[in-house]
C-alpha cells in the first residue's frame, strides 16, 4: 500500500495500526456525527505544500474497469477522490496554477472533473475556445500528476442525442489530442433527463466508439436516467441499467446525489447497483439538489462511507467561489491568488477533510 502525500506523523500512525491488525479502512456507518469542525486556518499567502514524490498517476498509471470496480495498472481496486469545476464559461478564473497546487498538494486530491457546459453560454457558442480550455486544464492537471475527467456537461435539453454531433466533434478533438496520456477519463453525458434509459443507451452506444477510435484504453463514464440518479428521480431503479447495460467494455455508470435532497432510497439504489455494475459518483453535494441551502453532513457522510467501502470514486461539486453553499470557496476568492483554509465555506472545509483522508493505492 502506498500512502501518497501524507504527513509523516500520519504515515507512522497508520503503519502502527496496521502492525497491530487494526482496521483503518472506513466502513458504512449509521451513527456518523453530523457536525464539522473547521480546520486550522492557513494564512492567505501561505504557499501550498511542496509536491511529493508519488502522484496519483505515478502510483496507478492507466486505469481500467475490472469486474465492477476501477483498477490501476497493477490490477488493484482503487478509489479516486477529488473535485469538479463549476461551468468553465463562468468560473474559469477558479482554475489556475495556485488553486491547482492547493488541490493537488494541500488537499491531496487524485482527480478533477472539467465541466464543459454545452448550452448556457458554453461549448455551442465557441467550440474551439472551450475545447482549447479543456486541453489547457488537462495539461495543468497532468503536470501535477492528477487524473482529469472530461465532462460533457449536457443538461438542458435533457436528451443527450440533441447534442450528439457536437459531442462527436468535441470528443474526437480532445481524445485525438490527448490519446498518449494515461490520466484521462471521459464522461460523455452529465445528466440525461426527461428521456428513457433506452434513448440514453442509444446515445452512449454511438458516442463510445467515437472516443475509442482515438483513445482505445481510457475509461468512459456513462450518464444514467433522471439526472444520473439511476432512474430513481423518475420513480425507477437501478435495475433498468443492470438488466440492460450499454454494449461496451471498460465503461462505468455515473450517479449524482445531493445529500439534503436525496435520502435513503437513493443511497440504497447506489449500494445495490455497485454490486452489479461499475459505478462512479461524478457529482455530489452536501446541500439540496440545486447545490445550495443548509448542509446535511450526516447524510453525505453515509454516502461517502459506502463509497469508501465499495471503492466508488467521487468528485464533489464544486471548485469555485459561486455564492451558493455548494461552492467550496467564499465569494471573491478566485483570481485572488489565495486559497487557504480561511477562504473555505463550511462545505469546503468538510470536503477538504474528506479528500485528505490517505489513499489506499
Question: Where do the language-model regions lie?
Answer:
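Alpha-helical transmembrane segments and their juxtamembrane interfaces
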Residues: 14-15, 123, 161, 293
Amino acid at each position: 500500500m502506498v500512502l501518497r502525500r501524507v504527513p509523516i506523523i500520519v504515515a507512522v500512525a497508520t503503519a502502527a495500526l496496521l502492525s497491530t491488525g487494526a482496521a483503518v479502512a472506513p466502513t458504512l456507518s449509521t451513527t456518523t456525527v453530523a457536525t464539522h469542525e473547521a480546520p486550522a486556518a492557513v494564512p492567505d499567502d501561505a504557499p501550498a505544500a511542496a509536491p511529493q514524490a508519488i502522484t496519483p498517476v505515478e502510483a496507478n498509471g492507466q486505469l481500467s474497469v475490472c469486474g465492477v470496480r476501477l483498477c490501476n495498472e497493477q490490477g488493484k481496486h482503487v478509489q479516486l477522490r477529488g473535485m469538479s469545476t463549476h461551468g468553465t464559461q463562468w468560473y474559469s478564473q477558479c482554475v489556475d496554477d495556485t488553486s491547482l497546487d492547493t488541490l493537488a498538494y494541500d488537499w491531496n486530491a487524485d482527480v478533477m472533473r472539467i465541466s464543459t457546459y454545452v448550452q448556457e453560454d458554453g461549448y455551442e457558442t465557441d467550440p474551439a475556445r472551450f475545447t482549447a480550455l479543456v486541453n489547457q486544464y488537462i495539461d495543468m492537471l497532468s503536470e501535477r500528476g492528477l487524473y482529469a475527467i472530461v465532462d460533457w456537461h449536457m443538461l438542458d435539453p435533457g436528451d443527450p442525442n440533441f447534442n450528439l454531433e457536437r459531442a462527436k466533434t468535441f470528443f474526437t478533438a480532445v481524445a485525438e489530442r490527448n490519446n498518449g496520456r494515461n490520466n484521462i477519463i471521459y464522461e460523455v453525458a452529465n445528466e440525461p433527463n426527461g428521456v428513457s434509459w433506452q434513448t440514453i443507451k442509444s446515445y452512449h452506444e454511438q458516442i463510445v466508439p467515437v472516443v475509442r477510435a482515438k483513445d482505445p484504453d481510457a475509461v468512459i463514464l456513462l450518464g444514467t436516467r433522471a439526472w444520473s440518479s439511476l432512474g430513481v428521480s423518475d420513480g425507477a431503479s437501478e435495475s433498468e441499467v443492470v438488466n440492460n447495460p450499454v454494449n461496451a467494455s471498460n465503461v462505468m455508470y455515473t450517479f449524482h446525489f445531493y445529500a439534503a435532497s436525496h435520502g435513503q432510497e437513493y443511497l440504497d439504489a447506489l449500494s445495490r447497483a455497485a454490486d452489479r455494475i461499475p459505478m462512479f459518483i461524478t457529482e455530489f453535494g452536501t446541500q439540496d439538489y440545486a447545490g445550495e441551502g443548509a448542509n446535511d453532513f450526516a447524510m453525505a457522510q453515509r454516502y461517502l462511507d459506502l463509497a469508501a467501502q465499495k471503492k466508488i470514486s467521487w468528485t464533489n461539486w464544486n471548485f469555485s467561489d459561486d455564492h451558493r453553499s455548494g461552492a467550496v470557496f467564499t465569494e471573491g476568492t478566485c483570481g485572488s491568488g489565495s486559497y487557504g483554509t480561511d477562504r473555505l465555506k463550511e462545505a469546503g472545509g468538510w470536503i477538504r477533510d474528506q479528500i485528505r483522508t490517505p489513499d489506499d493505492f
